[in-house]
Amino acid sequence: KREALLRQITGIKKKLESKENREMELELQQLEDELEAIPVEKPRRFFADDCSSEALTNLLANNGGTLSVISSEGGIFDILAGRYSSTANLDTWLKAHCGDPISVDRMSREAEYISNPCLTAILTVQPNVLDCIMANTTMVGRGLLARFLYSFPTSRIGTRTFRTPGIPKEVRDKYRELIFRLMALPMGEEPQTLVLSQRAEEMIADYFEEHEQFMVEEGQIFPDWAAKYIGAILRIAGLLHAADMVEGENEISAETVGRAMEIGKYFLAHSMHAYSTMGADVNIAKAKFVW
């Protein structure tokens, strides 16, 4: 429809170049108003790399509130720490993690409102980057670092082979099929609500009690992260449920929750390692090594 209106507007403007016509001027104004009321369609963005919080808010607003920040470097943390400003701006990241509405009103651009933002971040960074961000009191104090799931794979240096086999084609094809099926899911006006089956809820309740005891005994190392742990397991369960693609089924099974718990235990151990070693005092780190 925009293209048709643009053609009409262009045609009327050409006619008005040669002579004035009040009726045509009114028609032109009406067509321009109609064109302005039609939202501009932009290509969908799925990924972003290094971008400021302001740019991230804009990308979320232009993409239905969803986006992934995927980077193989830690530059995004420099930006968050205030590379382009004197202070760290973490609000968009914090709100997009839990789906809180984002409302931005600034003189320099149009107001932006995102009712249900959803941001995914996948960052592969060197340990020294984690050292720096773990020592950043703003990121720690605002709870940004407690929202990440950490993984510390064992270094393979010294055991690598020159001719490393690639990812099997069958695995690549299945992964590609899964991603495209997920992307094809219709985005409704309102988010779908997932619920736990009775058994799944009982499993989570029991594990919650167990984790609370863990918080007392060992959670002092990373209390902010550990406090969000059960919530992270429920998020993982939701992702697994979506990946299973049971159409029209909004109930998460006990089997799915069990898988989510196993994944969660992996991240619990690795995140505990991150908090106990990254950004720690050098002398404390040496003492832990000796111990």
What are these regions (language model features)?
Residues 1-291:
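Phosphate-handling catalytic cores of nucleic-acid transaction enzymes
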